[in-house]
Amino acid sequence: MSKIRKGDEVILNTGKDKGKRGTVLRVLPTGQVLVEGINVVKKHAKPNPMRGIAGGIISKEMPVDISNVALFNRATQKGDRVGFKTLDDGRKVRVFKSSGEVVDA
């Protein structure tokens, strides 16, 4: 079970986009995450009519290391660390370390 999952709202801790929030689009097996609107770079693409790719300058999100993001806690309006807790019914859930509040029900 991963501490950061697809669809989570995260905040960036370091780098050029420090303090920005975004939604996780994808968690990569290399320990990196793609976050919507974070670490956007411009790529120059050649047109490829066989694949239907138009040429030009394309803005694209690049992966960020998972250690550089923190799960956003709406109650405190800050990034928060995540831990795990086993509930009485045997389910393992993620909890915020600062408050003990369950992240996913």
From Swiss-Prot:
<comment type="similarity">
    <text>Belongs to the universal ribosomal protein uL24 family.</text>
</comment>
<dbReference type="InterPro" id="IPR008991">
    <property type="entry name" value="Translation_prot_SH3-like_sf"/>
</dbReference>
<dbReference type="GO" id="GO:1990904">
    <property type="term" value="C:ribonucleoprotein complex"/>
</dbReference>
<keyword id="KW-0694">RNA-binding</keyword>
<dbReference type="InterPro" id="IPR005824">
    <property type="entry name" value="KOW"/>
</dbReference>
<dbReference type="GO" id="GO:0019843">
    <property type="term" value="F:rRNA binding"/>
</dbReference>
<protein>
    <recommendedName>
        <fullName>Large ribosomal subunit protein uL24</fullName>
    </recommendedName>
</protein>
<dbReference type="GO" id="GO:0006412">
    <property type="term" value="P:translation"/>
</dbReference>
<dbReference type="InterPro" id="IPR041988">
    <property type="entry name" value="Ribosomal_uL24_KOW"/>
</dbReference>
<keyword id="KW-0687">Ribonucleoprotein</keyword>
<dbReference type="InterPro" id="IPR014722">
    <property type="entry name" value="Rib_uL2_dom2"/>
</dbReference>
<comment type="function">
    <text>One of the proteins that surrounds the polypeptide exit tunnel on the outside of the subunit.</text>
</comment>
<dbReference type="GO" id="GO:0003735">
    <property type="term" value="F:structural constituent of ribosome"/>
</dbReference>
<keyword id="KW-0699">rRNA-binding</keyword>
<comment type="subunit">
    <text>Part of the 50S ribosomal subunit.</text>
</comment>
<dbReference type="GO" id="GO:0005840">
    <property type="term" value="C:ribosome"/>
</dbReference>
<dbReference type="InterPro" id="IPR003256">
    <property type="entry name" value="Ribosomal_uL24"/>
</dbReference>
<comment type="function">
    <text>One of two assembly initiator proteins, it binds directly to the 5'-end of the 23S rRNA, where it nucleates assembly of the 50S subunit.</text>
</comment>
<dbReference type="Pfam" id="PF00467">
    <property type="entry name" value="KOW"/>
</dbReference>
<dbReference type="Pfam" id="PF17136">
    <property type="entry name" value="ribosomal_L24"/>
</dbReference>
<keyword id="KW-0689">Ribosomal protein</keyword>
